[in-house]
Swiss-Prot record:
GO CC annotation: Golgi membrane
Annotated binding of 3'-phosphoadenylyl sulfate, by residue: 155-161, 213-221
Residue spans of biased composition, Low complexity class: 18-30
Descriptive protein name: Carbohydrate sulfotransferase 14
The family this protein is said to belong to: Belongs to the sulfotransferase 2 family.
Residues annotated as glycosylated: 110, 368
Topology class, membrane: Single-pass type II membrane protein
Pfam families: Sulfotransfer_2
Cell membrane is among the record's keywords: no
General function of this protein: Catalyzes the transfer of sulfate to position 4 of the N-acetylgalactosamine (GalNAc) residue of dermatan sulfate. Plays a pivotal role in the formation of 4-0-sulfated IdoA blocks in dermatan sulfate. Transfers sulfate more efficiently to GalNAc residues in -IdoUA-GalNAc-IdoUA- than in -GlcUA-GalNAc-GlcUA-sequences. Has preference for partially desulfated dermatan sulfate.
Keywords, sorted A to Z: Carbohydrate metabolism, Glycoprotein, Golgi apparatus, Membrane, Signal-anchor, Transferase, Transmembrane, Transmembrane helix
Enzyme kind, highest EC tier: transferase
Length: 376
């Protein structure tokens, strides 16, 4: 059997338009006006915070927040029928007796999705989105027509390896060797490449999935990678961040020594809808209200979840998701905890609302940075 589909409840649309708060223009380009419906998400943020808080209270009651390490977002792997275009849409999985905490998280995620996505004015499909949001979404959904699935890629959540897998399934690559340099655009098909009627057909009939990660852990991973290793990001973003937020910075900083708090201050001033994809919230990248995903995998169970997806879509047995290399040192809950304990509390409180939908919709606990927790 498949996991329970993440399908929002239907609700009547509202003609009411909601206002937007002006934001600082993103680095490196001017802000342009967007056509289409009014942008609704910023006005829904307070509602999302309330919903997230109610979900977190339930998690506290069950004792889930006492552990720093996030639990998987869905039941452990189960054998079942693989996906094909004629199969019925996935339905729920039964849980074993020891999976009560897991059930709580899944229930919170589905309840929050229904509550947030069921609000009047929230999008029901990609054509309910403003033009700019729809463009971002369609540019992040990869298509496999041979295996009839759609994958919304999220940077810093193993998307490079998923792109390798898609190229192997399409016959472009012979294997998923992670030592090969990855071209992130060529030989890949995105929903944005298709006509509207082709997009609608695939959204209705294909298996749809994405993978998520603790939002702050994802930010730390992006910070370490982009500002610690990639000169282009240091020059394009790092230099301006230093000029903005570091007292006494010269007129031409190198941008190769951005601190994590400086990066977070930059995020506070950015409009989430126009962020770089490596730190744009998953909600804006994949629009889980506008696209009804059949499965949400987690970075914490990456290899097992990914191989389960490959089984569902009937990928050849020799195609397996690449194992993490022994030399790779990802941002971990422990390293995140260390960095967050050195971030001013007020700054963290300003950053969290930008990602509150990612925390609440995907059942990730908010960070514990109390004095007691930080001195353990």
């Amino acid at each position: 059997m498949f996991p329970r589909p993440l399908t929002p409840l239907a609700a009547p649309k509202s003609a009411e338009t909601l206002g937007r708060t002006p934001r600082r223009a993103p680095l490196g380009r001017a802000r342009a006006g967007l056509g289409g419906p009014p942008l609704l998400l910023p006005s829904m943020l307070m509602f999302a915070v309330i919903v997230a808080s109610s979900g977190l209270l339930l998690m506290i009651e069950r004792g889930i927040l006492s552990e720093m390490k996030p639990l998987p977002l869905h039941p452990p792997s189960h054998k079942g029928a693989a996906w094909s275009g004629t199969d019925p849409k996935p339905r729920g999985l039964s849980l074993d007796a020891g999976d009560s905490d897991l059930q709580v998280r899944e229930d919170i995620r589905n309840r929050t999705l229904r509550a947030v996505c069921g609000q009047p004015g929230m999008p029901r499909d990609p054509w309910d989105l403003p033009v700019g949001q729809r463009r971002t979404l369609l540019r992040h959904i990869l298509v496999s027509d041979r295996y009839r699935f759609l994958y919304c890629y999220v940077p810093k959540v193993a998307c490079s390896n998923w792109k390798r897998v898609l190229k192997v399934l399409a016959g472009i690559l012979n294997n998923v060797d992670v030592r090969l340099k990855m071209d992130h655009r060529s030989d890949l098909v995105f929903l944005a490449d298709l006509r509207p009627e082709e997009i609608r057909y695939r959204l209705q009939h294909y298996f749809k999935f994405l993978f998520v990660r603790d939002p702050l852990e994802r930010l730390l991973s992006a910070y370490r990678n982009k500002f610690g290793e990639i000169r282009e990001y240091q020059q394009r973003y790092g230099a301006e961040i230093v000029r903005r937020y570091r007292a006494g910075a010269g007129p031409s900083p190198a941008g190769d020594d951005v601190t994590f708090p400086e990066f977070l201050r930059y995020l506070v001033d950015e409009d989430p809808e126009h962020m770089n994809e490596h730190w744009m919230p998953v909600y804006h990248l994949c629009q889980p209200c506008a696209v009804h995903y059949d499965f949400v995998g987690s970075y914490e169970r990456l290899e097992a979840d990914a191989n389960q997806v490959l089984e569902w879509v009937r990928a050849p047995p020799h195609v397996r998701f690449p194992a993490r290399q022994a030399w790779y040192r990802p941002a971990s809950p422990e390293s995140l905890h260390y960095h967050l304990c050195n971030v001013p509390r007020a700054l963290l409180q300003d950053v969290l609302p930008k990602y509150i939908l990612d925390f609440s919709l995907f059942a990730y606990p908010l960070p514990n940075v109390t004095k007691e927790a930080c001195h353990q």
